[in-house]
Amino acid sequence: MKNTALVINTVFKNCDLWELFFGQLDKHFSKDIKRYVFVDQDDEKIPSDCEVVLYDKTKKYQEQFSSCIGSVSEEYCIYISEDYILYDDVRMDLIENYKNILDKNKNISFIRFIRGGVVDMGLPVYRYYENLYELSNRLPYFYTNQAALW
């Protein structure tokens, strides 16, 4: 998939999940997408096909992420964390459709892969796209650490 990267955010203290996480990722996610791992410490448990981008663990999350994202050259990022264990194949056709929606709707900056948040706010369906809902940036919990395309 052109111009798309997989950004995996993790921390070394969670390395006990990596074997399961990367094993399931290899089974269920396209190998045609470049993989970046944002982490505070490199380790041999991180597969060699991933580009490791180190951050300073003494910084706040926002600063950690900001210091790493500049290493990603692709136009689109699929964001996940190491605790997002895949149990089925990722529908790359949906991701391609979502990229097209982002291309056509410049007022959208990201699409979450989970409808949710802390409360159901009765959000409207976004411009006739099935299963997409508009989320105002004025609502609480506008930013959440969820799997997303941006």
Predicted regions and their residues:
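A structural signal for short, well-ordered beta-strand segments and their strand-loop junctions
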Residues: Y36-V37, C77-Y79, S109-I114, L149
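N-terminal anchoring/stem segment of glycosyltransferases
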Residues: M1-K57, S67-Y76
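Short catalytic/ligand-binding loop motif for oxyanion handling, primarily in non-cytosolic enzymes
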Residues: C15-L17, D43-P47, L86-D89, L94, ...
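Conserved donor-nucleotide/metal-binding helix-loop-beta segment in metal-dependent transferases, i.e.
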Residues: D88-V119
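A recurrent flexible, glycine/aromatic-enriched loop bordering the glycosyltransferase active site
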Residues: Y133-W150
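Short beta-strand-to-loop acidic/aromatic patch adjacent to the donor-nucleotide binding site
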Residues: E75-Y87
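Well-ordered, non-membrane alpha-helical segments in soluble/globular domains
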Residues: W18-G23, Q62-E63, R91-N100
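Histidine-centered beta-alpha loop that forms part of the nucleotide-sugar donor binding/catalytic region
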Residues: V11, S81-E82, R115-G116
